[in-house]
Amino acid sequence: MNQTLHIENVVLGGGEAGKYLAWDLAQEGRPVVVIERALIGGSCPNIACLPSKNVIRSAKVADLVSRAASYGVRTEGATVDMTGVRQRKREMVDGMMAIHRRKFAVPHLEFLLAEGLLVGPRTVEARLAEGGSRRFVADRLFLNLGTRATIPGIPGLADARPLTHVEALELDRLPSHLIVIGGGYVGVEFAQAFRRFGTQVTVLEFGTQLPQPPESGPWASAPVAHNSRT
């Protein structure tokens, strides 16, 4: 391990909030180290927001093709190739990673792919993915630790080896039947996408209606439920 280095700012976690904070600090000429364990740029461009929208776009095209005859276009024999859907998604993620690497490679900013551990007051040890470690004492330490998918404690569910959104985005074949537990926006967008690909889908929602964002009002559940069936 090298000697402990003093630095003005350390951001633990390079996800959505942390990366923009780090970029702004660096632009102001204020030294900052970003320590990220695995996903450059966080969940959104790697395993969540953007990849899911990429897959949803493919599903929208599949749905349009399935209704092409109503537009006077014949598309007999068209099929969904999930390997191709996944490859398109992966290429988008690779492109986003290239963009993030460039944005992190700026003056006053150092990006470390490492596991960060708090080992003392405002002191972080970065265990580097490539081996070795470094230690920093920061004037300001920002925690941007993010979230992770969890499996609810439903009896027997863990034994069924369920998928989270992370694994669902990596499927290379269509399941004959997909059960989605939870009718929130993530569950519904996956449900509709796979239905449009041709999978039979069942959504299990614990409430009496599909949840809706507070700003949308109670009127949103009915049209969302209707559109999810198409």
Where are the language model's segments positioned?
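Conserved hydrophobic packing residues within short motifs/helices of P-loop NTPase cores
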Residues: 10-12, 33, 143, 179, ...
